[in-house]
């Protein structure tokens, strides 16, 4: 590796020749040789310190491409119980999000209909169940509306949305109910 070095006499000559540039310092363009520093190499045969996951491949699974459709957030989990749904809604309320219910009669899974661009927004439009629950402060109110929506549309997919009314965006959505046989 080549290194450019400037002697102090050269820097002094440059500074005398151009008084406007007297504060300039020569650039540092190389590193010192590594042979000047003592090096201790430690051999590490521990598999957990290796960057790859080669030792853990047997326990990793991916989403099976056949037979299972991907739904919204948390779709990899088994259906949530009422208590688990209440905890999710409590989380939305703690984050000052407005809960809202939406339902879809035909396609609750991810597909492309109105938009061909990749990404989360795939062109699906769900129907809103009533209005967003702006005054809601308890998860039992949301679960009550969920039960009403189930009775009105037993074959529909129903999702709960957390809406941020300050930023005017949907923050979270997840499937709260899948029709029987799906």
Curated annotation (Swiss-Prot):
Transmembrane segments: none annotated. This is Ribulose bisphosphate carboxylase small subunit, chloroplastic. Heterohexadecamer of 8 large and 8 small subunits. It comes from Betula pendula. Pfam families: RbcS (PF12338), RuBisCO_small (PF00101). The basic functional RuBisCO is composed of a large chain homodimer in a 'head-to-tail' conformation. In form I RuBisCO this homodimer is arranged in a barrel-like tetramer with the small subunits forming a tetrameric 'cap' on each end of the 'barrel'. The keyword Chloroplast applies. HAMAP family: RuBisCO_S_bact. The lineage of its organism: Eukaryota, Viridiplantae, Streptophyta, Embryophyta, Tracheophyta. Keywords: Calvin cycle, Carbon dioxide fixation, Chloroplast, Photorespiration, Photosynthesis, Plastid, Transit peptide. GO terms for biological process: photorespiration; reductive pentose-phosphate cycle. The gene is RBCS. One of its GO terms (molecular function) is ribulose-bisphosphate carboxylase activity.
């Amino acid at each position: 590796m080549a290194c450019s070095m400037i002697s102090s006499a050269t820097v002094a000559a440059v500074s005398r020749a151009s008084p406007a540039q007297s504060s300039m310092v020569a650039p540092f363009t190389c590193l010192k040789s590594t042979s000047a520093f003592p090096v201790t190499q430690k051999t590490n045969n521990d598999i957990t310190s290796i960057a790859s996951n080669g030792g853990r491949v047997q326990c990793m699974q991916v989403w099976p491409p056949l037979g299972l459709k991907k739904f919204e957030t948390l779709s990899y989990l088994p259906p949530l119980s009422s208590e688990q749904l209440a905890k999710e809604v409590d989380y939305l309320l703690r984050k000052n999000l407005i809960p809202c219910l939406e339902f879809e009669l035909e396609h609750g899974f991810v597909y492309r209909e109105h938009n061909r661009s990749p990404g989360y927004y795939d062109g699906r439009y769900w129907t809103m169940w009533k209005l967003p629950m702006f005054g809601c402060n308890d998860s039992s109110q949301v679960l009550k509306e969920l039960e009403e929506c189930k009775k009105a549309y037993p074959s529909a997919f129903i999702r709960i949305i957390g809406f941020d009314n300050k930023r005017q965006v949907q923050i979270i959505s997840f499937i709260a109910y899948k029709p029987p046989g799906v």
